[in-house]
């Protein structure tokens, strides 16, 4: 049986739509899924980056040790592309062992690997805490900036929460950042930290220890 050309075209078009409708839709990450980023046993998933004068990153006693360098020092998580980019929390414990600048520079993606920011703890002489950068302003200049006291060789539990509309952070039980970011430009501070995208730990002229690093997916806020 022969069909008119117009009818044949409609049949083909309808079939195409039916096939398209049958394509699987990517499922959203299940809330509460926990991913261990550093287990204290290996640095295989991390890669040290030397931007010139950087300290070594080593595994010692179950800790990630970022040794003091003359510049930014740290390591990048090699499997970041497989992680959720939004609606997640990262938790860790960190301590400053020597030095007078930031002992936590947690660079993280916000939506995709091209849009990242850095949670800074102890910057600009040892106390500034905030996120670099928002609308081009770094952690010492924007609304997230605050002064927190950090003692050497004391462990600090840190939590970062990332959603499409908000960035939040806690040091211990104290919430130090609660910043709405809808419509704002998110980026890292121009300079050496750009070599540590999209997920990393860094320090500046400081030795630090990191442990118990986990990422947990969270439900999309309503």
Region locations from a protein language model:
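Juxtamembrane cytosolic interface motif at the C-terminal end of transmembrane helices
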Residues: 17-19
């Amino acid at each position: 049986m022969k069909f008119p050309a117009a009818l044949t075209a409609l049949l083909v078009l309808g079939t195409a739509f039916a096939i398209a409708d049958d394509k699987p839709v990517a499922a959203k990450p299940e809330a509460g899924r926990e991913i261990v980023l550093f287990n204290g046993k290996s640095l295989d998933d991390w890669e040290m980056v030397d931007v010139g004068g950087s300290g070594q990153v080593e595994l010692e006693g179950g800790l990630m040790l970022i040794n003091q360098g003359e510049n930014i020092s740290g390591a990048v998580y090699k499997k970041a592309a497989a992680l959720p980019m939004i609606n997640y929390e990262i938790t860790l414990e960190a301590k400053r062992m020597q030095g007078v600048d930031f002992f936590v520079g947690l660079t993280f993606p916000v939506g995709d690997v091209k849009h990242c920011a850095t949670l800074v703890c102890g910057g600009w002489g040892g106390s500034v805490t905030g996120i670099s950068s928002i609308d081009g302003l770094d952690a010492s200049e924007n609304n997230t900036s605050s002064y927190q006291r950090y003692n050497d060789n004391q462990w600090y539990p840190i939590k970062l929460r990332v959603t499409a509309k908000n960035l939040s952070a806690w040091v211990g039980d104290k919430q130090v950042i609660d910043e709405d970011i809808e419509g704002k430009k998110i980026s890292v501070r121009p300079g050496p930290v750009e070599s540590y995208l999209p997920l990393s730990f860094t320090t500046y002229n400081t030795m630090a220890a990191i442990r118990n690093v986990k990422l947990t997916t969270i439900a999309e806020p309503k």
